Amino acid sequence: MLSAIVGVNWGDEGKGRIVDYLSQDFDIVSRYQGGNNAGHTVVNEKGTFILNLLPSGILRDGTVNVMGAGMVIDIEHLVGEIGRLREKGIEISPENLKISDRATICMPYHRIQDCLEEDRLSDKKFGSTRRGIAPVYADKYMKKTIRMGDLRDIDGIADHLRDIVEWKNLLIEGGYHHEPIDAEKMLTWLRTYGKPLLPYICNTSEYLSKAADEGKKILFEAQLGALRDIDYGIYPYTSSSNSIAAFSTIGAGIPQLHLDESIGVMKAYSTCVGEGPFVCELFGEEGEILRRAGNEYGAATGRPRRVGGFDVVASRYGARVQGATAIALTKLDILSYFDKIPVCVAYEIDGKRVDTFPTGSALNNAKPVYEYFDGWKEDISDCRSFDELPEAAKKYIDFIETRIGVQIKYISVGAERDSIITR
């Protein structure tokens, strides 16, 4: 069984807690793209955990976690993340964590370049997390990066790194007028943070292929959402990798295999971190009330998330490009006690009603067409079956399910690990 858990919207949908919940039924959890530019928040009996690089299955005993070839890894951040989890009693060893030798290393100069470019763009910025993600993916396709497997022989790639740094300084020093990168310091950085990771680095493609042949259950964990995918998202306000489910087996390291199911995750309302069009955004007091109720601040950056009503148009599109066979709806409990709940059912562009998700500048001109639903004035966090939910909540879910066209199989009604309804 090969399953993917992917974001339907702009990211921050709650994928981490769904992975944590479902990973009990899987042998392996694999991240397949992205870096430490997003955070997956998981709450369990040991506390609250924010994972930037490690797969969310690391919090489950007996689950093997794989960091795939499609990832870009800041090794300094990873060493720190492993250390912080160990301090909270989480066991991490080569038995439950395996890192692809083909994964790309995000270097300190990638972070520097990211910050310099975002500052240069000023009010035209893309909303980067400043973690170096776009520069490292760009360098990957320029074939000017270091990979995790290279950490086994840093002396052997020293001249290659020096050549890369010389090339990189043409931009850093010549273009941005910043102090040049010191290649020897970069080599020291690789040795310092690479050494503790060596036991985890292996041929994960071979490992996953063998596991699949043996009938092991593998769960692929996406970072960000469909609308941040480099090809199918709201370009250029996207990430720099493919976050869609179709890329999961490729990025993980088993491109010869295909998914059996794709579980799309979306919130019961809309949130967005970063720049770009966000049609159903709520402003002022209305938006602030929802933001505070949902504690909507980026797990990786701490930035306040933009919030809005549920967007049927964007979510239907996201579910389609993700090939979603089922939906997990998160944070339904946050909408408790609202008098009226807005749902964006269509867009209006240049005076015309539009039901399909547009691309390019048309999205900038879109206005939301709302329908309003009655709220429910009660706590639903103890509900563990669909029938226990208030009628207004059930009506809200049924409407969304009908409009999206995919079954809502999982519904989260609280932050705790078991606060999920399975239909």
Residue locations for each model-derived region?
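Non-transmembrane, aqueous-exposed alpha-helical and coiled segments at domain scale
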Residues: M1-R423
